[in-house]
């Protein structure tokens, strides 16, 4: 029964890759990219300064995370791509698993007939797991993920804490 539950989860996962879902996600991505700030505004070196105290760091980070959220998402996306391109074994494992799941789902529950015999879908999934897990451990996904988290945090929080807020927001925060 546990295998049927796992198979149902995988089936629901692959249904998320339907053309309608892909189109709606693409439109959502386009609207998110429309809120990107210009490079001149994002890399404005005139607005970079050392914060006076930790309270100022907190207010800068809170403001800049909202204001530059699309830019920060793009930076994290670029760092993710860089991570996969520098760890080719991990990229291979990800492609292998996705291609294996898509290929098994194209069988639509039928057996795969080869000259070596016929294989049921649960046998194919088991074979995929038996191949992907050991190679996945060799690809060091945990250290790659930790590097990605660290590099993203340093990049995003470093920029957000050093970039000054616009002068208008300083006057809005003051109470008279």
From Swiss-Prot:
Compartments (UniProt record): Golgi apparatus membrane; Peroxisome membrane
Membrane-crossing segments per the record: 84-104, 129-149
Cleaved signal peptide residues: none
Pfam families tied to this protein: PRA1
Coarse class of the protein's main subcellular location: Golgi
Modification N-acetylmethionine, positions: 1
Record's keyword terms, sorted: Acetylation, Golgi apparatus, Membrane, Peroxisome, Phosphoprotein, Transmembrane, Transmembrane helix
Membrane topology: Multi-pass membrane protein
The organism's place on the tree of life at top rank: Eukaryota
Modified residues (Phosphoserine): 18
InterPro entries: Prenylated_rab_accept_PRA1 (IPR004895)
One of the record's GO cellular component terms: Golgi membrane
Record text on subunit structure and interactions: Interacts with YIP1 and the Rab GTPases SEC4, YPT1, YPT6, YPT10, YPT11, YPT31, YPT32 and YPT52.
Sequence similarity: Belongs to the PRA1 family.
Additional note from the record: Present with 5500 molecules/cell in log phase SD medium.
Protein known as: Prenylated Rab acceptor 1
